[in-house]
């Protein structure tokens, strides 16, 4: 990852991200502007780290779930056939797991190890997939840095923030920004020097679709020249799943 990104940055100068841009100018008769999807990046269970590998999983009918590893939680202690009547337990033997969720090339993005340590995985992964989407689109930060590029992200999970409050040893001056949902989008805009609208929207399961709708409206209205649209959700801790069949 580091080598690939370093080469891309040198030669040309992130969870799912999609880049959309106007396919043509608004017609003189007032017809709606066409919108084109020009690049994509993603991270999904089953080690799908690109649109091509994700599509391969779908076409091959691959089961992308896997047994719950011990480094996530002790499932033998927490598992129950009747979680509704056993507080603090859950029924789950397998999970859709994004591998290497703790890995992050902080130095590539100019982020200090101290700050990276308290960044929500949603922030880290979507920053990487945003960069991947730009590469996939054949776009460079030299071209779009400082331009009116919008960033619209759908996100709703705050379990990493909850974990920070429970396990307080790692809290530092970056914890607030590192766990805030709004920063998922704002960090991309800051790191890439994008000057367009930058926001996170939470409409539960429709968050990403709502973000896409807002991005299309923003591009069509001229609020931004191009938009990066994404969605992020990760559950790193058991506050939400416990007492539920998952």
Residue ranges and their predicted role:
Residues 2-5, 20-238, 244:
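Cys-dependent condensing catalytic cores that perform Claisen condensation/acyl-transfer
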């Amino acid at each position: 990852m580091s080598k690939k990104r370093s080469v891309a940055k040198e030669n040309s100068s992130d969870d799912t991200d999609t880049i959309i841009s106007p396919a043509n100018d608004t017609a003189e008769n007032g017809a709606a502007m066409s919108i084109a999807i020009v690049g994509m990046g993603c991270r999904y269970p089953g080690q799908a780290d690109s649109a091509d590998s994700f599509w391969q999983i779908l076409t091959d009918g691959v089961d992308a779930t896997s047994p719950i590893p011990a480094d996530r939680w002790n499932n033998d202690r927490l598992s129950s056939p009747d979680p509704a009547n056993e507080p603090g337990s859950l029924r789950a033997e397998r999970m859709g797991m994004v591998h290497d969720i703790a890995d992050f090339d902080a130095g590539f993005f100019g982020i200090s190890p101290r700050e990276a340590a308290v960044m929500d995985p949603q922030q880290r992964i979507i920053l990487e997939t945003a960069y991947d989407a730009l590469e996939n689109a054949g776009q460079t930060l030299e071209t779009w840095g400082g331009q009116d590029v919008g960033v619209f992200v759908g996100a709703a999970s705050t379990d990493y923030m909850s974990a920070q409050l429970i396990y307080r040893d790692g809290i530092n001056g970056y914890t607030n920004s590192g766990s805030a949902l709004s920063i998922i989008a704002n960090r991309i805009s800051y790191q890439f020097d994008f000057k367009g609208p930058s926001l996170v929207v939470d409409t539960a399961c429709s968050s990403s679709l709502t973000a896409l709708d807002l991005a299309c409206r923003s591009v069509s209205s001229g609020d931004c020249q191009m938009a990066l649209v994404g969605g992020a959700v990760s559950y790193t801790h058991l506050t939400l799943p416990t007492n539920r069949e998952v």
